[in-house]
Amino acid sequence: MLSADEKQLILHAWEKVHTHQEDFGAEALERMFTVYPQTKTYFHHFDLHHGSEQIRRHGKKVVVALENAVHHMDNLSAALCKLSDLHAYNLRVDPVNFKLLSHCFHVVLAGHLGEEYSPQVHVAYDKFLAAVSDVLAEKYR
């Protein structure tokens, strides 16, 4: 899993994410809807236009959930259990979408963190987001 150094890199970078939760989350969702239009099917009831209040609110929910995971990196299963249940049993989201959103979140991080999104930070976040995606997909097995 994540080394102690990688966890520190994630926590340090998260300090910048924390102050822009709604913006980063909305941008990641908008990117996902643009690059992977098939993901829109789960949001048929949303206004999917740029800057939509629904996308901004949901984007913030996504980033708040990631923040919970950031602060519970040693026990992601417990931290994300309810969210995993919701997506598997109620929303029935195809688990591949977690990986698609993770990729879009990487792009958002790289764009906003600039040089601070070093190769080491990228690797740490890649491992972290892959672990989050795996935990969210646990209930599908």
Swiss-Prot record:
Q: Which CDD domains match?
A: Hb-alpha-like
Q: Assembly and partners?
A: Heterotetramer of two alpha-D chains and two beta chains.
Q: Which GO terms describe its biological process?
A: hydrogen peroxide catabolic process
Query: Gene3D superfamilies of this UniProt entry?
Result: Globins
Q: What does the record say about tissue specificity? A: Red blood cells.
- Annotated Globin domain residues: 1-141
> A GO molecular function for this record?
organic acid binding
Signal peptide start and end residues:
none
Record Pfam families: Globin (PF00042)
- Protein name per its UniProtKB record: Hemoglobin subunit alpha-D
Native species of this protein? Phrynops hilarii (Snake-necked turtle)
Question: Which keywords does the record carry?
Answer: Heme, Iron, Metal-binding, Oxygen transport, Transport
User: Which Gene Ontology CC terms are recorded?
Assistant: blood microparticle; haptoglobin-hemoglobin complex; hemoglobin complex
Q: Provide the binding site for heme b.
A: H58, H87
What is stated as this protein's family in its record? Belongs to the globin family.
Protein task: Involved in oxygen transport from the lung to the various peripheral tissues.
> Which PANTHER family is this protein grouped with?
HEMOGLOBIN FAMILY MEMBER (PTHR11442), HEMOGLOBIN SUBUNIT ZETA (PTHR11442:SF41)
